[in-house]
Amino acid sequence: MTEQKTNRTEEQLEQELRKSKGGKLSGKILSMLGVVIAVAGIILGGNLVLVVIGRVILGLGQMVQGKSKEQSDRQAFDAIAPDIVGTVFENVQMNPDPPLLDANDTNIPLPNHTCCSGSGYIRGTYHGLNTELCTVRLTEVSEFQREETGMWEKNEQVVYTGQWMLSELNREFPTWLTIWPRDKMDKLFRSKTIQTGNEDFDKRFNLSSDDEEVVLRILSPDRMERILALAGSSIGKFAVNLKPDGRLYIAVHSGHGFFDIGKGRENPAQLRERFARELRWFTDMIEVFCGE
């Protein structure tokens, strides 16, 4: 009976994914039409009517695309997420209130932003550890003046979308540490970072703490090798913040959230496999910091 129910759910999801592709295509066509009309209005001496009509159609097209994807994401979440999460966590709570995970509570370096928001919170216990995951989005709001109308408008741009997890390790540490990607500018200007002695690790990551000697005892050679191994299978650049009270924050700049259908090209079985793989990556990182 359970298998029949699962098959029906996945058939419904497959139908929803097909609808999503059609909705996204319609939205793209509307968006392109809106751009063409707006550009034509500008070329024709700043025809305000055409510009406004073009912008309205463009906005409508973007809304259609967004709504279509949102519906498919929800369908995928309802059909797949409970099973995936239930195999990893116990005592699962969907949308716990208030959430434990707060991106502003960490010193993980993030892009400049105006607003930080979290969504899709899920809480459970992983091997007895309170654990919570969510999607974090950062947006930057700016104002600009349109030449063709002279009107000031606000522009809201998403500058970061990532998957985050918080796990309470039920133990204390003598200091804090933060690990984050070492980019080209860091290498060019030789930004200050704690050197671990592991050449591969030092090339790939920055490390900060308020006690260099102690943090190198926490970040043992075995832990560094395990982190490097996980870096090879990561779905994006990631950062880790371990606090003295044992709270471990893991942040992956993947460009999407947990249980996100992406471009809608995967069938339900492929989505299930990817969702499970992404969640397993996070729990593997928790394991790195468990024990001595």
Identify what each model region corresponds to.
Residues 2-9, 73-89:
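Juxtamembrane membrane-interface segments of multi-pass membrane proteins
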Residues 1-24:
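Cytosolic juxtamembrane N-terminal segments of multi-pass membrane proteins
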Residues 82, 86-91, 96-140, 144, ...:
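Charged, low-complexity intrinsically disordered regions
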Residues 19-29, 111-113:
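Loop-to-transmembrane boundary segments
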Residues 56-83:
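Transmembrane-cytosolic junction motif
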Residues 24-45:
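Canonical alpha-helical transmembrane segments of integral membrane proteins
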Residues 42-56:
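Hydrophobic alpha-helical transmembrane segments
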